[in-house]
From Swiss-Prot:
Top enzyme class: transferase
Major localisation: endoplasmic reticulum
GO cellular component: endoplasmic reticulum membrane
GO MF annotation terms: phosphatidylethanolamine N-methyltransferase activity
Protein's UniProt name: Phosphatidylethanolamine N-methyltransferase
Membrane spanning stretches: 97-117, 121-141, 207-227, 235-255, 285-305, 312-332, 386-406, 414-434, 464-481, 496-516, 570-590
Lineage, top ranks: Eukaryota, Fungi, Dikarya, Ascomycota, Pezizomycotina
Catalytic activity: a 1,2-diacyl-sn-glycero-3-phosphoethanolamine + S-adenosyl-L-methionine = a 1,2-diacyl-sn-glycero-3-phospho-N-methylethanolamine + S-adenosyl-L-homocysteine + H(+)
Statement: the UniProt record of this protein carries the keyword Lipid biosynthesis: yes
Function: Catalyzes the first step of the methylation pathway of phosphatidylcholine biosynthesis, the SAM-dependent methylation of phosphatidylethanolamine (PE) to phosphatidylmonomethylethanolamine (PMME).
GO biological process: methylation; phosphatidylcholine biosynthetic process
Entry's localization field: Endoplasmic reticulum membrane
Keyword line: Endoplasmic reticulum, Lipid biosynthesis, Lipid metabolism, Membrane, Methyltransferase, Phospholipid biosynthesis, Phospholipid metabolism, S-adenosyl-L-methionine, Transferase, Transmembrane, Transmembrane helix
Cytoplasmic side: 118-120, 228-234, 306-311, 407-413, 482-495, 591-963
Length: 963
């Protein structure tokens, strides 16, 4: 599912539509009642009033959909796929018969196949249907989300067009679809009246029904053919296994039903990929229990079925299917949810971006930009930074020591003691520092006493905490390695199950740590509000929407997972000690500071707690309240006792720090050679032409003569190569015969990429625009300005205009060309003149005289050069690109790193200064970025890429005089 909507809320639909339909319904009721009630006025009046109330109630319960073009329509009531297929009261159609027949063939195969073929065959069948779900449906939804491709294809093929209009080439298909779809929705639906987006979604639903039902049935059949009772299993173990399995299956069924109650068919079948319902996004019921419950806890039934089947084959295929579903969530659904329900906010012109506490921490002055050199994550490792260098050396030390020493009792005890000491320092030592930092800023005062700033104290603390975290978890892993022994027989003592369960717990802790870091950032991860007064308010998003302190339990699951894998008492005791210290740290370090800083804004109960309490029966609620009261009194007594004794207890957060990053797969250009299309016969390439225009680079067209050529080679050439600005839009005009193919397209390529001028050998990688709209998807039509305009001088010729901008450009320097292709192929009809895209070097010859006048003048000069460059890098989009040096960048700059990478690339080639992409969203406007450039050039003056102005080598007689 991609979203959740509150079914009980009244939809925000246009009032006139609702009023008009309500009046019409009331009028119909009145007329019918009047006809039936002649001579029975009181009864007729009563029935009329009752019918009116029912009509109003039905009208109020209706939902209204809205298509991308703004069309509002009534969303008919639909039913879930199980009811549609198996409920005899629901109308049936041909597609139901087909689905039931395919399911019957699956069941028949489970009985008919030989025993030795059942497992591999049904494993292959389930993998096929699971791939159809995660890959097939995933591709369809992704192209629909990005390009509305399913709707575009439905329009292009005319499958929902009335044959009477003459636009439908397949009348039989239209009548079949009309009969099939209207049979399922007897009320409020007519195929010819519904928007094409809704009709396309209904057709998509039928495909989804087939895949989901076959996926579930094939999985159950695979579990059935693999099920068995282990040899020597005790009766109590068999009963416990089946009871626990059915409990998990029942819980899974309840999760699915409650989720469907909340989201209805609209979100269950990814309706918001096609249209939107005028209702608010909400989270209710099971959606308060866990993040993405349909894909997280919604698959626990798989493990219940695996438990009842007592088969590792079923368990492993369940894990693979669950992982595939999570990948589907990350790749397909999450990007669409972010785009649809969390779009970037509009940029307020002229409003400066405030710096948060983390940025204030690293800012030396009011005007200086914030540092963006993050500490966590493999991508942020920097060997020039002392904490990173230290952690790598310590990890090498631990690894070498673990591998070089034998697994004797002495060394095992030594590694356990070492892990305990590291945990005690991480918990008690760092907890003591944070406690006094919260009360009297002792850590910061120490650095201020020696003339350092609060920012320096913050940086030193981050390094200390980072090294301590790595040592704490590294020593624990080393101790586990010393205590671990590879099982001699994996089939004995539940060895496989212990390893699988332990690995799952470790993965869950890693996911928890990543979720916490993604939500808190570096400032929250390193307890930044202990050092600075953070002006932001508490927000409960991501994992914090369900849990107030996720590290309390989930942050230590990996420790117990390691204890399961090693099956060692010492590791279990070490995990228990670590968990207890984590709980103490939360209670005596974090919680008092949170109450001191945020006060009443702290939430008392998380979403999971509220959900569990609401689900309890009244007697259990009363008992729970009494237990909570006793625990609160006992807690108050313990706190008073501890405060009176004044021991400072501290503990550390026991979480594994691993910053996972998105993997960007870079595919190499695949060479393709296309054969000449027979449709080229009779076409004259001379009738095709391309011309272009764009913003000419003023400083890039410098002479290429270096003085090393011959006399003839030093003269400038007569023909000047067109040189365009980096990132500026390129307007292209084309001409072609009037009978040219509507599938023609123009692509942008580097000159060196293609050896042939007749056939293009490399893919365009998205840098192309069709000549005519409506042929390809909607996204590609965005580059079309005009199409097929007749030439007044040549009636048999047409012309058009298009623009290459944004992602259709090459964001690098080089020599490029445009190619006109025929009929959707790679056959070239025309090639434009080559042109260059260059970034002009900043005119640094004026540095000395400008700096003599004042550094502010030099900074203004940098700003004036930087502003148009940044505007080009931000696609000249008024919602993103600034119009002045003080105007902040749009929020997409922070969301999509491509903009920042463009800017730092351009700065590197214009000013000779190399920045990390993260500095662009951190600075937030051109003025701060210019300040950073000026400051960097001043610091790196002897090492910059600028021309040297130092003392030159003496020449001639002056050199001889110096000898």
């Amino acid at each position: 599912m991609s979203a959740t909507t509150k079914g009980g809320q009244e939809p925000v639909a246009p009032t006139n539509i609702r009023k008009r339909r309500g009046v019409q319904a009331e009028g119909d009721t009145e007329s019918s009642t009047a006809q039936d009630g002649i001579g029975h006025a009181p009864t007729a009046q009563y029935e009329q009033s009752e019918d009116q109330e029912q009509a109003k109630l039905r009208q109020a319960n209706k939902s209204y959909g809205r298509t991308p073009d703004g069309t509002v329509f009534t969303v008919p009531t639909t039913h879930d796929m199980v009811s549609q297929l198996l409920d005899p009261r629901q109308p049936k159609n041909l597609s139901d018969v087909i689905v039931l027949a395919i399911l019957g063939m699956h069941i028949l195969a489970a009985y008919a196949l030989p025993s030795h073929l059942k497992r591999p065959v049904f494993a292959a069948i389930f993998i096929f249907w699971r791939a159809s779900y995660n890959i097939g449906i995933g591709i369809l939804l992704r192209v629909q989300s990005q390009h509305k491709l399913l709707v575009v294809k439905a329009k292009k093929w005319g499958i929902f067009e009335d044959p009477a209009s003459g636009k439908n080439p397949r009348p039989w298909l239209y009548h079949l679809l009309k009969r099939e779809l209207e049979a399922k929705i007897p009320e409020d639906y007519k195929l010819e009246e519904a928007p094409i987006e809704y009709n396309t979604w209904l057709l998509f639903r039928r495909v989804v029904d087939l895949i989901l039902m076959c996926d579930f049935v094939s999985y159950c059949l695979f579990a059935a053919v693999c099920g068995s009772t282990p040899d020597g299993e005790a009766p109590w173990a068999t009963v416990a296994r089946w009871v626990m399995g059915w409990v998990l299956v029942g819980l899974n069924l309840w999760i699915k039903l409650d989720a469907h109650r909340v989201v209805k068919d609209f979100a269950w079948y990814w309706g918001d990929f096609f249209y939107l319902i005028d209702q608010e996004l909400t989270f209710d019921g099971v959606f308060e229990l866990a993040p993405h419950p349909m894909y997280s806890i919604g698959y626990i039934g798989y493990y219940g079925i695996s438990m009842m089947a007592a088969s590792y084959d079923v368990l492993f295929i369940s894990i693979i299917a669950h992982l595939a579903q999570l990948i589907f969530l990350v790749v397909v659904e999450n990007p669409h949810i972010e785009k649809t329900y969390n779009p970037p906010p509009p940029r307020s012109a002229g409003q400066m971006q405030p710096l948060d506490g983390a940025k204030d921490a690293d800012s030396a002055t009011r005007d200086s930009p914030a540092t963006v050199h993050n500490m966590l994550g493999f991508k942020n490792i920097d060997l020039f930074r002392v904490p990173d260098y230290t952690t790598i050396l310590l990890c090498i030390y631990l690894g070498v020591l673990s591998l070089a020493t034998p697994k004797t009792e002495f060394w095992q005890a030594a590694f356990i003691v070492h892990a305990v000491l590291c945990r005690l320092w991480f918990s008690l030592g760092l907890g003591w520092i944070l406690t006094f930092q919260s009360k009297e800023k002792r850590f910061t005062r120490h650095f201020v006493k020696y003339g350092e700033s609060a920012g320096e104290a913050w940086r030193q603390w981050k390094g200390l905490y980072h090294v301590s975290t790595v040592m704490c978890h590294g020593s624990f892993i080393a101790a586990c390695w010393k205590m671990y022994t590879v099982p001699a027989d994996w089939t004995q003592e539940w060895s496989i199950l212990k390893h699988v369960t332990g690995t799952g717990l470790v993965a869950l802790q890693i996911w928890t740590a990543v979720s916490i870091y993604d939500e808190l950032g570096e400032f929250g991860w390193f307890f930044g509000d202990f050092f600075f007064n953070n002006r932001t308010k508490l927000t409960y998003r991501s994992i914090y929407r369900f849990l107030n302190n996720p590290e309390r339990v989930m942050g230590s699951l990996g420790l117990y997972g390691a204890a399961l894998i090693t099956w060692s008492r010492a590791i279990f005791v070490l995990a228990l000690i670590s968990h207890l210290l984590t709980l103490a740290f939360i209670s005596y370090v974090e919680k008092p500071h949170m109450q001191k800083i945020y006060g009443q804004s702290i939430r008392e109960e998380a979403g999971l707690t509220k959900f569990v309490k609401r689900s309890l029966p009244p007697p259990v609620k009363e008992w729970s309240d009494s237990v909570d009261k006793v625990l609160d009194e006992a807690k108050a007594f313990v706190e008073d006792f501890v405060e009176s004794a004044r021991p400072k207890l501290a503990a550390g957060v026991s979480t594994i720090v691993r910053d996972t990053t998105a993997l960007f797969n870079t595919y190499p250009a695949r060479l393709t050679i296309s054969q000449l299309n027979p449709s080229l016969a009779g076409l004259d390439p001379k009738q095709y032409s391309l011309s272009l225009e764009g913003t000419v680079a003023q400083k890039a067209a410098s002479g290429r003569s270096t003085g090393k050529e011959s006399i003839h080679g030093r003269f400038p050439k007569d023909v000047k190569t067109l040189v365009l600005e980096y990132g500026a839009p390129i307007r292209v005009k084309w001409t072609a015969p009037a009978n040219h193919s509507k599938n023609d397209w123009v692509g942008l390529y580097m000159v060196i990429d293609n050896r042939s001028r007749e056939v293009t050998e490399v893919p365009s990688q998205g840098r192309w625009v069709p000549t005519c709209p409506g042929v390809y998807d909607r996204a590609t039509d965005g580059g079309i300005i005009t199409a097929d305009k007749p030439l007044p001088s040549q009636p048999d010729m047409v012309q058009g205009e298009m623009v290459f901008e944004g992602d259709r450009l090459w964001w690098t320097q080089g020599t490029f060309e445009l190619r006109y292709h025929h009929d959707g192929s790679h056959n070239v009809m025309s090639v434009s003149e080559p042109f260059e895209i260059k970034i002009g070097r900043f005119d640094e010859d004026l540095d000395e005289e400008v700096l003599a006048t004042g550094g502010g003048v030099y900074e203004r000069a940098v700003e004036s050069e930087l502003l148009p460059l940044v505007r080009n890098c931000l696609d000249r989009d008024p919602e993103i690109a600034p119009s002045t040096v003080d105007e902040p960048f749009g929020s997409p700059v922070e969301r999509d790193s491509k903009y920042a990478k463009r800017v730092v690339y351009a700065i590197h080639h214009m000013f000779g200064i190399e920045f990390a992409p993260a500095v662009v969203p951190a600075d937030g406007n051109v003025r701060k970025l210019a300040w950073r450039i000026c400051n960097a050039k001043q610091v790196l003056a002897p090492y910059s890429m600028s021309k040297s102005r130092g003392t030159t080598t003496p020449l001639g007689e002056k050199f001889l005089e110096t000898l």
